[in-house]
C-alpha cells in the first residue's frame, strides 16, 4: 500500500501527481495485454490459442470465486473464530484467490498469439505477479497473518506453497 488514504495525498502536489501517474501507468500496461489480444491477426475466428486462453480464463475466474467462497464459508462458521483456513484450495496455496486472479491476466498472452504486439500481452501477467507477490496483496496479507496468528501461521507457511498451487510440503512435525 503506497498511500494510506486519498486525504493524505490530495494536499501535496507531488504525492497527488505520483498517485495519478502510477495509476495511469498501471492501466496503460495492463490494458496493453488486452490491446495485443484485440489486434491479433489470426485468420481463424476462434483458433486453438483462443480456445485454450478462453478455457483458462473461465477456469481461473470460477476457481477464484470458489476460493473466495471457501474462505467466506469458513469465516462464517463460529467454530473457526480466530483460525485461518487450511482446507480446500487453501491447502494447496496460501493465496489461491491471488493465483487465479493472476491466471486471468496470463490468458491474454494466449489470446494475443498472432498479433504483431503479442509481446505486450506479457505486461499484464508480469505486472500483476510483481504487484501481488511483492508490492501489495501477499506481503500485506502475510504480515497481518503472522502478527495475528504467529507460530501457527509460520507452520502453514512452511507446509503450504505461497502462490502457485501445489501439494503441501511435509514439515518436521508431519509423519511420512
Regions inferred by a protein language model and the residue ranges of each:
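Eukaryotic endomembrane system proteins
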Residues: 21-26
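Hydrophobic transmembrane alpha-helices
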Residues: 1, 27-70, 74-176
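Juxtamembrane helix-capping/reentrant segments at transmembrane boundaries
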Residues: 3-18, 83-90
